[in-house]
Amino acid sequence: MASTSSQGTPQPAPWRASFLEHLSKMDSPEFVFSSLHPAPKNSPTDFLPRARYCIFRGFWAELPENKHNNAPVNERNYESEMPTFTTDVRMGKPLEVFASSSGHADDRSQTQGSGGGGPCEAVWWVKETMVQWRIKGEAFVVGPDIEGKEGEKESSGVRTVKSEVGSRMRVVQEEGREGWSWSKELTGHFGNNSPGLRGMFCTYSSTCRAWD
């Protein structure tokens, strides 16, 4: 179980209810995620914008129910206004989130775990309501190292994620809170993906075979 900040608990955003209501009308909750990609050497700027379509997987700590997901999931102890999506470390997004952060990772070997914090922007166009939603902030990666083996020292990336993301989570249910787990939340998100998508995230020898 990883700690989350209880000081200065954030209040629900005033736009939260309308945002979720609008997204519930979409056939597929697609949005455009924009981040900053390292520019080529000798470029007049350090970064170039990159955008791609992603699927909104719910707010962090509010994993949507899925009857086909057999993974263990957390109790609904927290809620937030932090949009989530799933990606593969081999894709460009994790590198961009790390490279444009204060840590300035410049190699993929430095982006294999939790961390990041680079600037980002997400845009939803809800044609059913003719409303555009835009959220700006910092993006963080929650990776398999988010809860290492007992006795292992946490990486700086893990500490950053738990501090920055944890401070934006608010308690909605005290009962069972001690059992809430970052790793369980991550596994739950993986289990909510379709079997085909889960298979694309893994090599043949990896544990994703257990989800078939």
Task: For the regions a language model picked out, list residue spans one by one.
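Binding-site signature for planar aromatic cofactors or substrates
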Residues: M1-D212
